Design a protein with these regions (language model features):
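N-proximal low-complexity "stem/linker" segments adjacent to membrane-targeting elements
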Residues: 1-30
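Conserved donor NDP-sugar-binding/catalytic core segment of glycosyltransferases
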Residues: 93, 106-145
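Cell-envelope/extracellular polymer assembly enzymes that use nucleotide-activated donors
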Residues: 7-9, 37, 183
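Non-catalytic, C-terminal membrane-associated alpha-helical segments of glycosyltransferases
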Residues: 219-312
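A short, conserved alpha-helix in the catalytic core of glycosyltransferases
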Residues: 165-169, 175-206
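Short beta-strand-to-loop acidic/aromatic patch adjacent to the donor-nucleotide binding site
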Residues: 86, 94-106
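Conserved nucleotide-sugar donor-binding
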Residues: 155-170
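Acidic donor-binding segment of Leloir-type glycosyltransferases
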Residues: 26-72
Length: 312
């Protein structure tokens, strides 16, 4: 079966994205394999987002605008609820795959054809995607561009699920504190699906991730809190913070990440994940740590340079 024989639909939650969404729409319109339907869910946008989308709905019958009521609270549960509302409009259709596409993403014209091909090649592939790049002048600079990258994780900005897998994980769980995409992908692995990021292609993320409401340093602090929130192992997350010391913001970014994790631990921040998922997550982290521990010894024995810990 070729990738072109598979069909897909897209849902895009969007809130005040007038600066980016037109480029996203143009990227999808230019695809060599277009979606069967695309529902763009405006989450109470108060800028020009809706009018931009309406212009394209008049040109392309497979694009639909769904407007949610206006509200002031910007949080991740709202994004999950928007996705669910958009997906409800699609469930009666016949399709194989469903994609979650952020409203500030662009990519090349064969992006989805490439991903559809991966699903055709791998019957157990449940979720896939590619790295995202935040600086278009450095397309090879992303969090998967090193030897220690976790290719089983799929970033939430542009995920695509096999329909059966999406049903198995229960869709995106509406959790106010975030990590809805991480929970979906990790649950998929726990239920026996393969999840994979393919680095042969990238997409471009035009708003720096994690900085919508925070400075870069506070974004790192909140990432640390989130690492605790989803049940990350203390040893792994502390080492992860030290590995991030070399990243921008230099030194402080990694320390803020560690501080966020341990602040959440000391204040006993509520964790929304099940004990089963937390245990699975920690077991995966410890398995990766053992593999990383063995790799330097094997590399030294073979006289091979060991990759840095950036982005672990």
């Amino acid at each position: 079966m070729s990738g072109a024989t598979l069909t897909y639909v897209l849902v895009t939650p969007a809130r005040n994205e007038e600066s980016f969404i037109e480029a996203t729409i143009r990227s999808v319109v230019a695809q060599t394999v277009r979606p069967e339907r695309w529902v763009i869910v405006s989450d109470g946008s108060t800028d020009g987002t809706d009018e931009i989308v309406r212009r394209y709905t008049r040109q392309f019958s497979w694009i639909e605008l769904l407007r949610m009521p206006e509200h002031r609270d910007r949080q991740f549960a709202a994004k999950a609820n928007c996705f669910a509302a958009g997906y409800e409009r699609l469930k009666s259709l016949d399709f194989d795959l469903v994609g979650n596409l952020d409203a500030d993403i662009t990519f090349g014209p064969d992006y989805y054809e490439f991903l559809l091909g991966k699903f055709s090649e791998r019957p157990k592939l449940g979720v896939t995607g590619t790295p995202f790049v935040e600086d278009a002048t450095q397309p090879d600079s992303h969090s998967y561009a090193h030897g220690a990258a976790n290719l089983t994780h799929v970033s939430g900005a542009c995920q695509i699920f096999r329909r059966k897998c999406f049903a198995d994980v229960g869709g995106y769980v509406a959790i106010k504190g975030g990590a809805i995409d991480w929970i979906a992908v990790t649950t998929a692995r726990m239920k026996g699906w393969e999840t994979r990021t393919f680095v042969e292609k990238v997409c471009f993320h035009h708003r720096k991730i994690g900085t919508g409401n925070h400075s870069p340093l506070m974004a790192r602090f909140h990432y640390g809190r989130k690492a605790y929130y989803v049940g990350g192992h203390p040893l792994w997350e502390t080492l992860r913070g030290f590995f991030q010391i070399k990243e921008s913001p230099l030194l402080l970014g990694g320390l803020y990440f560690i501080g966020g994790y341990w602040w959440a631990c000391l204040t006993r921040m509520h964790r929304p994940v099940s004990r089963e998922l937390m245990a699975f997550h920690r077991a995966e982290q410890m398995a990766r740590l053992r593999n990383l521990w063995r790799r330097p010894q094997k590399s030294r024995d073979a006289g091979v340079a060991v990759p840095s810990g950036k982005g672990v």
